[in-house]
A protein has these predicted regions:
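Topology signature of small-to-medium multi-pass alpha-helical membrane proteins
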Residues: 1-158
């Protein structure tokens, strides 16, 4: 889409500006992701004690948790870099997860884990497309509107 840049003040006046709408649903799914990641940490500690701190799969779980934080922190703050940073962190986490399968202890490597990873890859596609194409995300974080938006022809652009 050909986006038209608007000023931050114009963006704030736009009806789609703000942390609202489908952005809440996307946020909720990411919070669920954090909960499932923490559940993974609990599973590793329960099954292997605290020794897994030296196990790559344990570190990967914590890294995955850290990679989800930029979106969760930056989205409500309306940080301009949120879409780019969040997409990059998300796909780095997926790549690490996919690359870590060989390091996971046998009991943790099961169909449940594979199903979760498949879900999160599919969600990653939705997450990425939403952050790239959403009108709300573009207005709020990137201060730009679509070509048919009334603000695209504002006096500030002339």
């Amino acid at each position: 889409m050909n986006w038209t840049t608007i000023t931050e003040d114009e963006a704030r006046l736009h009806p789609l500006y703000g942390f609202a709408g489908w952005l809440w649903a996307v946020y909720a799914v990411e919070v669920l992701g954090i909960a499932l990641t923490l559940e993974g940490v609990i599973t590793v500690v329960r099954d292997y004690g605290l020794n897994p701190i030296t196990n790559p799969s344990f570190g990967i779980v914590w890294l995955h948790l850290a990679l989800n934080l930029p979106f969760l922190l930056m989205a409500p703050m309306k940080a301009r870099l949120m879409p780019v940073v969040s997409i990059a962190c998300y796909w780095v986490g997926i790549a690490i997860s996919l690359g870590s399968f060989g390091t996971m202890p046998g009991p943790l490597m099961n169909v449940s884990i594979l199903a979760r990873v498949a879900f999160w890859v599919a969600w990653g596609v939705v997450f990425t497309l939403y952050l790239l194409r959403s009108r709300r995300v573009n207005v709020t974080y990137l201060h730009r509107v679509g070509p048919n938006d009334p603000m695209a022809a504002s006096p500030a652009q002339a």
